[in-house]
Amino acid sequence: MYAMKIRILIRIAVIVSIVLLCTGFGVYSFLRMNAVENRQDFNLFTLVPQDATAVLETDRMADLMEDIDGLHCSKDEHFLYVSELFVCLKKYFNTLVGDTPHGLSRQMNKMLISFHEPDTPLNQVLYCSLGAGDYELVESFVRKYCSSTFPSKYFDYNGEEIRIYPTTDGRFLAAYFTPDFLAVSFQKRLIEQVIDACRSRQSLMDMASFRTMYAGKRNNVAATVYVRMKEVGMGKNTDGIRPQTHLGSWAEFDMKFNEEAVYCSGISHGADTARTFINALRRQEPIKDFSGERLPASVFFYNQWAISDLEAIFGFTSQQEYAKAAYSDYIKKRDGEWMEFMKTYAGENVMSCLFHSKDTTDRHPCAVMSVAVKDEAQAERALQKLLYVTPEEKGAPAVERTYPNYRRYPRARKYRQYMLPRNTVLTQLTGITESALHTYACFYKGTLLLAPDAQSLSAYVDALENGDVLDGTSVYEEGVGSLSPYYNFAMMVDMEEMMRQPETYVRLVPNFFFRHSDFFRHFTIAIQFTCAEGVVYPNLVLLYKGEKIGEFEEIGN
């Protein structure tokens, strides 16, 4: 009996030990999984300094690299070199993945790149979450591919360690490691700013404007780009005026790829009372469909604005530097008269375009702005009356008068042309100052046409009369097919052709595209802003044109 009791006690002790062991293992596993989960949820935006101008985010780094490699432009070796960090990552990415038998951890697939002023390929920071074992993997990888000519150095910054690694091309990479994340940059000062942002809790996520806009990554999106749309440089670097446009506040763009195109679908929540491009568009009633039947077939740039609220539009455009460059009391008065004329007779949209003339020796392209009018006959009578009572400008700069060239464009002969007193209406909406603010006008089938020279009007009317229009062409249909039929502003531009034009004709295209001309000249770019219930939806589409692009020389002004 005594021996039986001993066996029972031993059996109970063994069972209790097993239960305790299982319980302990379960608690350990739970704590371990909880720690991993916490590491997964680490918000990299709490590291980004508040002066960042843009941030690229992905939680599918491997998929993003695969998508980029699948683009036809990548296969043709056309790459956008805006970040040396991304170039290095792309260069060594397959090797890094090869060092991990099961691919990158879920945490390492989460990556940010923040962009900072000045906008150069070296002024970025790359951030990456780290999972279990990732710290050792990354440290080993960095040491493996850094130069052995110089030893790595370590610096203390406010109690945190910054490591400096020499690279094989003679540069130095600054890195900040923790068990949860890493941050690397070619600029040590940017890593110092990352440490400051993290420790002081003054990161991008601590800014109300960004935090309100940020909603986390969406599903089925390769990457998201967050852009601070403040003062944006426009046109070419060689433009003496160096125009800038105040677009608005933060916007986020979800990126998707196919072989022939890159699609960026955006949203901008922020609203204020500033005279910005986006705020001006918010006050307009959207327009429907596109105007390919009113565009000559040789068009390489066009845009279309909704102008139901002219005060808002001209309140914004009148602030542009090129509109104020030659301002005077006389011009100011003419602008006021034209504002009243437009309020009375203009419809709800205006379109402008650049296209090639039949004369291949022309140094400048043809440029026309087309304003829909409510009643063409009444509007023309009002214009004639306005011209009759307008006083002559004293001391106006001498400008050679241009002529319609009806011999080359005979079908434009029956549409009367007018030379207007100097004003900035055309300049405000196109950026063109070539004619010293002199403008030519003509009425054509329900529209008022404005141009910096008479021949542009003739060439435009002649093309439309002959049915030589853009509508139905493959490039045009592909471009508009990627956009919404309802919008407040839309623009399409063949960047190869645009780069050939003088400075005064390209001021509506962001300078970013010209600074990276080696890449963007291979694309047709479509940009669209749609507004609904106070929210603005900007969209950007890059359509690859392929390899058949001729060499060109940029034309100076």
Describe the role of every protein-language-model region:
Residues 7-15, 19-164, 211-240, 263-366, ...:
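Structural boundary/hinge residues at secondary-structure and domain interfaces
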Residues 134-140, 171-173, 191-193, 270-279, ...:
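Short, surface-exposed beta-strand/loop "edge" segments at domain boundaries and coil↔beta transitions
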Residues 268, 305-307, 371-373, 451-453, ...:
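Active-site proximal loops enriched in glycine and acidic residues that flank catalytic Cys/His/Asp
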Residues 75-109, 146-261, 288-289, 331-334, ...:
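An internal, short helix-loop-strand segment that often contains or flanks glycine-aspartate motifs
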Residues 522-554:
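C-terminal regions of mature proteins
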Residues 1-3:
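Short, Lys/Arg-enriched N-terminal segments with co-localized hydrophobic residues
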Residues 196-198, 267-269, 278-281, 316-318, ...:
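Composition- and surface-driven signal marking solvent-exposed, interaction-prone regions
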Residues 55-56, 124-129, 181-185, 366-371, ...:
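Short, structured motif recognition centered on aromatic/hydrophobic residues
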